[in-house]
Curated annotation (Swiss-Prot):
Native source organism of the sequence: Dictyostelium discoideum (Social amoeba)
Family to which this protein belongs: Belongs to the ATPase epsilon chain family.
Molecular function terms from GO: proton-transporting ATP synthase activity, rotational mechanism
Assembly, per entry: Component of the ATP synthase complex composed at least of ATP5F1A/subunit alpha, ATP5F1B/subunit beta, ATP5MC1/subunit c (homooctomer), MT-ATP6/subunit a, MT-ATP8/subunit 8, ATP5ME/subunit e, ATP5MF/subunit f, ATP5MG/subunit g, ATP5MK/subunit k, ATP5MJ/subunit j, ATP5F1C/subunit gamma, ATP5F1D/subunit delta, ATP5F1E/subunit epsilon, ATP5PF/subunit F6, ATP5PB/subunit b, ATP5PD/subunit d, ATP5PO/subunit OSCP.
Lineage: Eukaryota, Amoebozoa, Evosea, Eumycetozoa, Dictyostelia
Key word Membrane present: yes
Pfam families tied to this protein: ATP-synt_DE_N
Record gene name: atp5f1d
Name of the featured protein: ATP synthase F(1) complex subunit delta, mitochondrial
GO cellular component terms attached to this protein's record: mitochondrial inner membrane; proton-transporting ATP synthase complex
Segments crossing the lipid bilayer: none
PANTHER family to which the protein is assigned, alphabetical: ATP SYNTHASE DELTA/EPSILON CHAIN, ATP SYNTHASE SUBUNIT DELTA, MITOCHONDRIAL
Targeting signal (transit peptide) range: 1-33
Length: 170
């Protein structure tokens, strides 16, 4: 009886190893005709890009900056305020400032970036960014309650990232 259990366990272990070795870690089923990623950049009020081809999209993840290209491992990532950099199919580089959001990287070499706001870097007004940074720094320093301090900190961190993106110093 024990030998039968051991034999069954060994067979199960061997089949489990075979199953685990078939796991995919990259989007290997993606189209073999292109070395490009298909991405969409979306906000609630605007579709900036829909199914656009790119070589690479660099994103400001909550756990650090990361790049997405064709064959990237599927994932869902929280995005923090920062810069999205798009290396387009033709080699052109484009940058957007986003307010945060989520990125969905799929096994079919597609990526959906959902954000509340996305603004081309060249459309950021340096003077407005400087004023916003000063305003939220003051709000943060003056905040007495935890809730007010947390709200001010969100604004401060967002404006700090905007300042960095457009080259404004404090």
């Amino acid at each position: 009886m024990i030998r039968s259990i051991i034999k069954s366990s060994n067979n199960l272990l061997k089949s489990n190893v075979a199953i685990n070795s078939n796991k995919r870690f990259f989007a290997t089923e993606a189209s073999a005709t292109s070395d490009l990623l298909t991405f969409s950049l979306l906000s609630p009020h605007q579709t900036i890009y829909k199914d656009k081809k790119a070589q690479l999209v660099t994103l400001p993840g909550a756990k650090g900056i990361f790049g997405v290209a064709k064959n990237h491992v599927p994932r869902i990532a929280e995005l923090k305020p920062g810069v999205i950099q798009i290396n387009h199919e033709n080699g052109d580089l484009e940058k957007f400032f986003i307010s945060g959001g989520f990125a969905f990287v799929n096994p079919d070499a597609s990526c959906y970036i959902n954000t509340i706001e996305a603004v081309p870097i060249d459309q950021l007004d340096a003077e407005e960014v400087k004023n916003g940074l000063a305003r939220y720094t003051q709000l943060y320093n003056d905040a007495q309650e935890e809730n007010a301090k947390a709200v001010a900190l969100i604004g401060l961190e967002t404006y700090q990232q905007m300042a960095f993106a457009c080259g404004v110093s404090a």
